[in-house]
């Protein structure tokens, strides 16, 4: 089986790290697993991996995974805004203060 086929069958983030022999901290992966895999996919998009030999696929995929993982060791997923729902989210301006004296029974 070709490496690209193996990668296509993986379902857990940990499996990608194991197959590509990339060390990781489980605490980082627990918080940012989907963001890391999404960013890896973005880095590989536009590359026809199926046309490449296994060695090239391994090198490209490993490099993309390492770069994506490194990004999320430095930044929080909410700040990276990888997913559309986070891209369009707005930070709240501040909390409104409602004094207790203004509340009625």
UniProtKB/Swiss-Prot annotation:
Give the highest taxon in the source lineage.
Bacteria
The UniProt keywords, alphabetically, are: Nitrogen fixation
The biological processes this protein is annotated with in GO are: nitrogen fixation
Q: Which family does it belong to?
A: Belongs to the NifW family.
This chain's function reads:
May protect the nitrogenase Fe-Mo protein from oxidative damage.
Q: How does it assemble?
A: Homotrimer; associates with NifD.
Identification of the protein by name: Nitrogenase-stabilizing/protective protein NifW
Q: Which organism is it from?
A: Rhodospirillum centenum (strain ATCC 51521 / SW)
Gene name for this UniProt entry: nifW
């Amino acid at each position: 089986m070709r490496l690209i086929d193996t990668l296509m069958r993986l379902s857990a983030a940990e499996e990608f790290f194991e197959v590509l022999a990339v060390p990781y901290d489980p605490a980082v992966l627990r918080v940012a697993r989907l963001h890391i895999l999404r960013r890896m996919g973005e880095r590989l998009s536009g590359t026809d991996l199926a046309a490449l030999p296994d060695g090239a696929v391994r090198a490209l995929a490993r490099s993309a995974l390492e770069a994506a993982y490194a990004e999320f060791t430095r930044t929080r997923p909410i700040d990276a805004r990888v997913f559309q729902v986070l891209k369009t989210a707005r930070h709240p301006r501040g909390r409104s203060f409602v004094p207790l004296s203004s509340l009625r029974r």
